[in-house]
Amino acid sequence: MAGVRQHGWRAIPAVCSEYGADTLPDRYRSDGRCLLFRQQAGISALKQELEVKTPYRAMNHPVIGVVTKADLASMEQISLVKSWLREAGAHNVLVTSAVNNNGVTELFALLHTEEGCC
């Protein structure tokens, strides 16, 4: 439909170990290793935006990394995941815990700024 943006996302499960992160399609691990979910946003843009000739246009947008459930992880685990997010291209990395309400206000503030918006 012309002039309408459609937004969607999908969660991609992965297992983290000392060797890295492995993607696990359609299954979860129960061996005690840390589970990661990388959420991937998909956007169908206006026809005019799709006609832009810049290669890999969508890949040039800023990325925000968010570490969730920080109350369940050690500082070492949080530090490791933060470094992975930075290596993956996240310009801003936030640590949040909904249980303790840590980092949630900062996340919403960042999402409502021009520079933090993806």
Curated annotation (Swiss-Prot):
One of its GO terms (biological process) is biogenic amine metabolic process. Pfam families: PduV-EutP (PF10662). It comes from the Bacteria. GO terms for molecular function: ATP binding. SUPFAM superfamilies: P-loop containing nucleoside triphosphate hydrolases. PANTHER family: PROTEIN YOEF. This is Uncharacterized protein YoeF. It comes from Escherichia coli (strain UTI89 / UPEC). The lineage of its organism: Bacteria, Pseudomonadati, Pseudomonadota, Gammaproteobacteria, Enterobacterales.
